[in-house]
Amino acid sequence: MKKIVSILVALSLAVVAWAQNPMERSMEAFPVAKETHILCQEACALLQNNPALAPQMVVEALQGGNRQYANAVLTYADETAGAKALVKAVKKVYPSLSDASKADVLYWIGRNKLTALQKIVDEGVASQEVSEASMAAVFAAVQMGGKHNMALLDGCIKAGSPLAQEIQRLRGQVNEDDDDSTRNELRDQK
């Protein structure tokens, strides 16, 4: 009986540890290279122990070229320090990023509805070239919603922007977790 109890206790402790470690959960869902996995675990541990490192770590990760690592750092920095703590650092580093890193930042802006970084979204949507970053800017504008973004997207469609087709596609696929006001605005703008 004692052996069964000790096994159950060990199992419950393992489940609790797994539930408290978001890094482990995400690594199971998305297979990555072993060295990237180790880097992500280290970053997660550093951020959990010292959230003040988040802005610096995000900048370094975004400039580093390892996209999986950069997204993991951005996610865990967001969870530990909060998105608003990262705004200033992201705004400063954004112009020097690769197109792929800019896209990752724009998806993050859209998911977090960071109006403090609206200018970055505006510039991406106004781009006259179709790139990963400009498509992510459209996504961010749709996710953020609001009259400004809806007018921006509508203006792109009317002007015949190369992004018009992507804008219309995304307007038709608004996420179910968006609030009703965003869904209504998108529906009314069609």
Outline where the language-model segments fall:
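Sec-dependent signal peptide recognition
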Residues: 2-10
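Cleaved targeting-peptide boundary
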Residues: 20-27
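Structural detector for internal amphipathic alpha-helices that build alpha-solenoid repeat scaffolds
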Residues: 28-49, 59-63, 68-82, 91-95, ...
